[in-house]
Amino acid sequence: MASIRVADEPAFVLHSIPYKETSLILDVFTRQYGRMALIAKGAKRQHSTLRPVLQRFQPLLVSWSGKSELRTLTKSEWVGGMPSLVGDALLCGFYLNELLVKFLAREDDYEKLYDRYAETINALSNLEFESKGLEEILRQFELSLLQETGYAAALDRCVENNEAPLAQEQYVYQPERGVRPVQVDDPGHWPVLTGKSLLAIAISDFSDPETLSESKQLMRFLLGLHLQDQVLTTRQILIDLKKI
């Protein structure tokens, strides 16, 4: 296999682990190539030019080469323009990164999801100027993640007749099928939503308090289905703090 070289690819660092004495192995989310594993040689050295650049939640341009699954980072440039995440926003950022690591296979491109992630990190970094709250920002990202990875059925159509839900009626989300009217023998853990909320969620509109509340249950349910037994540490912390 020929060695591949990629230059100046937009990326964010999702996670990093030490490698040997002076290097790091990075899990990065790139716009065109999806999740990539890169080794940053010498990045732990005190005077390394990479050390101050490889920060989470900051837009980067990265270059790499190699032919194995673990490529070698050859350059990383900080793009700038985003304030650092702090407080609750920082915890939410770690939650987003954990979701991406759990959901996305390596080297599958998700350009739309990358753009949504960048928009979400920007919103979190400028939270004081945002009209949306933390929950609304997170719900929009979770929905995009489920849609772009193919884990969410259509919310604006009933599976039984392919018609739009009626605003005042109640519906459940049935695993492997999608939205349908509530029945008396439905399992208690299936999320129940009004047609109004389903139609709003389908267009990523979480501005109504009832929709936001019902969407929280739906997103937890859908994420849980596909994460199965995998535990999201940051999500549990946020739940305990009643932030999501």
Swiss-Prot record:
Presence of the UniProt keyword DNA repair in the record: yes
One GO location term (cellular component): bacterial nucleoid
Matches recorded under SUPFAM superfamilies: ArfGap/RecO-like zinc finger, Nucleic acid-binding proteins
Gene3D superfamilies, alphabetized: Nucleic acid-binding proteins, Recombination protein O, C-terminal domain
Biological process (GO), any one: DNA recombination
Matches recorded under InterPro entries: ARFGAP/RecO (IPR037278), DNA_rep/recomb_RecO_N (IPR022572), NA-bd_OB-fold (IPR012340), RecO (IPR003717), RecO_C (IPR042242)
Keyword set, alphabetical order: DNA damage, DNA recombination, DNA repair
Annotated function: Involved in DNA repair and RecF pathway recombination.
Sequence similarity: Belongs to the RecO family.
Name of protein: DNA repair protein RecO
